Amino acid sequence: MEAPAVRRADFLMTLAYATDLATGHSRDFALRSCVLGMRFADVAALDLDARRRIYHQALLRYIGCNADTHLLAAHWGDEITLRRELRHIDIGNRSEFVELLVRALKRKFAGAPPEELEEAVKRGLAEGPQVNIPVLSGHCEVAQRIAERIGLPEDIRESLGQIYERWDGKGLPRGLSGNAVKFPVRVVTMAQDAIALNDHHGFAPMKEMIAKRAGGGYEPELVDLFLTHVEKLLAGLDGPVDRETILALEPEPHSMDEEACEEAFLAIADMIDMRMPFTFGHSRAVASLAAAAAKHMGLPASDIRDVRRAAYTHDIGELTVPVSTWMRAGPLTERETDEAHLHPYHGERALASLGRDGKAVGGRDGAGLGG
């Protein structure tokens, strides 16, 4: 039986939700920023090409951020908390940035004697750039590779290579500035920061912070247009965004054939597993074993396909648990155990847009015949 066509946007939403988990963002952060970006495109009267690039940049900005996460965790500790705090500050403000890094190191070395803690913080700050710069550069490269695997064109991939660049040139990996930063990057960076700041600080403080960063992190003309229409742009974006909304916003709806779907599932599997060295290839191996078992049971080809694809994504909910937790020797704390037990729930939500291709198994990951 021929499988029903799958919209590429469904895969984009799955990737978006997964990256929200891994980066500590609030619920439907990428989806809400996509809606905001497309509303901004409306008030700016942007053409179809610009809308297409903004749409994809908003959903996929952080898809490469699982790469080498173990290196960030080894140096800074809980990488999800670190990323959550990063979105509330202006990274171009050196004092704010250093203060955040000091907090991260103090969390990591909590319980150490004062002299050891002080030395660990000094050493961590001194060695930080040797960790951060190559890892963050790698995020851009991995994002571009994933985008290529799911069939996205070169102009979208180019924008994903600039996810940490800023208008003022204080970004990474190349320190680009002004119009050298791709237009979708400039729009989506501001939109996503607006969502995060509004969530954390409230509407009025968010407006002040966005205005203050004009000419720094953001292009001044974009800030002016955003603040002129800010009430309209953010209306209703303090809650979840449903699948139908994102599908309706897709500028050029695109369906994927069986071969493209298979590669997209593989890309998701690899994205899940790249956080830690000992999980590389895990989901592929589980999928191979599960498909072989399904074939041995005499299941029809369509069911074997569904089992294989569900196995590709079975661990997607684990992205909500920090790598520093998985890699630390010793038993989990009560809070960490609760986080680990919740990962099937997060997996089911992440896979909701893909329907039976993964949702059911994602919600039962970790279950066994013995209960």
Where in this protein do the model-derived segments appear?
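Histidine- and acidic-residue-rich, metal-dependent catalytic cores
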Residues: 2-371
